[in-house]
Structure formats: structure tokens, C-alpha cells
Regions:
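Cytosolic-side membrane-entry/anchor segment at the start of a transmembrane helix
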Residues: 1-30, 89-98, 144-164
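Long, highly hydrophobic alpha-helical transmembrane signal-anchor segments
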Residues: 3-54, 112-122
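Hydrophobic alpha-helical transmembrane segments of polytopic
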Residues: 17, 42-49, 104-108, 131-138
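Helical transmembrane-bundle signal
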Residues: 21-25, 50-60, 109-112, 135-142, ...
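Transmembrane helix-loop junctions in multipass membrane proteins, especially transporters and channels
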Residues: 30-37, 62-65, 69, 117-125, ...
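Membrane-helix interface/capping segments
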Residues: 58-85
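C-terminal halves and exits of single transmembrane alpha-helices
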Residues: 80-109
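Hydrophobic alpha-helical transmembrane segments and immediately flanking/interface helices
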Residues: 107-137
Length: 166
């Protein structure tokens, strides 16, 4: 149960971060008049990744209670076979996806840092400087959130493996 409770809490936080990022993007795009290229550049990653955070946060938050109840019921009915045939394969996929997410997030961080480094002193390229800063910020947030989710997933998977070892 702790795994699903923590998943739900983090997904709510993810949803809130996504909403804040989208609001920032709208403010940056439509309302900031000083250095507009910088803020328009920053708005794009905040909007794109913020929307992803909102969708992922909402979908995980809304499905977690039912998922927790279904899994608890099935483990209660047929612990070993359900865990072996359904829950461990599901978690194997989840854990494999974290590796993909991690590399994408690292690539975004590196891209953001390269853009920051290349365009930090170039007044004609403030769009890309803003883009790089926002991309790096969002990627670090995603990497951090996924790190903690992956750690919870490892603990949960270890608990599932104990059920099949008995």
C-alpha cells in the first residue's frame, strides 16, 4: 500500500508542477514584454513538458486507488500466480521504462546546458538561451521525480519477489 500511496502523492505534485509550468508558459508568451525573445524561448519547454506533467500526474492520480484495490484483491485471492503472471511483468515494464525516461531526461538536461552555454552572451540568440534554461529546469524536475518513483518501484518489486519466493 505504501507504494501506491506514494505514487498518488507524487502524481499530485507532478500535476501541480505541470499546472505551474503551463501558467508560466502563458505568462511568458503573452504578458512579459521586456526581453520577449528570452521568455518566448522559455515558454516552449515549460508548455510542452508542463502538459506532459499534467497528463501523467492526472492519469496516475486518477487510476491509483482502483489499481491499488484491484491488485490487493488479486494478491489476496491468488498471491503467487497473480504476482508471477501479472504484477511482476507489469513492474518489469515500468522499471524498464524508467531507464528510457532517465536517458531522455539526461539528453534534455545536456541539450539545455549546451544551449545555455552557447547563447548566454549572445544578445541575438536570447530565445535559445531561454529555451535552454527552461528545458534544463524541466528535465531536472522530471529526472528527480522519476528517480524517486524508480526507487519506490524497486522496493515494491522486491516485496513482490518475496511473495513468489515463499
Amino acid at each position: 500500500y505504501r507504494y501506491f500511496t506514494a505514487e498518488k502523492q507524487e502524481s499530485l505534485l507532478f500535476l501541480i508542477v505541470g499546472i505551474i509550468a503551463v501558467i508560466l508558459a502563458v505568462v511568458f508568451w503573452f504578458f512579459i514584454k521586456s526581453n520577449p525573445n528570452f521568455f518566448k524561448g522559455a515558454a516552449i519547454p515549460f508548455l510542452a513538458i508542463g502538459l506532459i506533467q499534467m497528463v501523467v500526474g492526472y492519469s496516475v492520480y486518477s487510476r491509483t486507488d482502483k489499481q491499488k484495490a484491484d491488485i490487493a484483491y488479486n494478491i489476496g485471492m491468488e498471491p503467487v500466480s497473480y504476482v508471477k503472471q501479472t504484477e511482476l511483468p507489469r513492474m518489469k515494464t515500468v522499471m524498464k521504462n524508467f531507464v528510457i525516461y532517465r536517458w531522455v531526461e539526461i539528453a534534455f538536461i545536456i541539450t539545455g546546458l549546451v544551449l545555455i552555454f552557447l547563447f548566454r552572451s549572445n544578445a541575438d540568440k536570447t530565445f535559445w538561451y531561454g529555451f535552454g534554461i527552461a528545458l534544463a529546469i524541466q528535465a531536472v524536475i522530471m529526472l528527480g521525480a522519476d528517480y524517486f518513483a524508480e526507487q519506490r518501484g524497486k522496493v515494491y518489486t522486491n516485496e513482490l519477489n518475496k511473495i513468489t519466493a515463499d
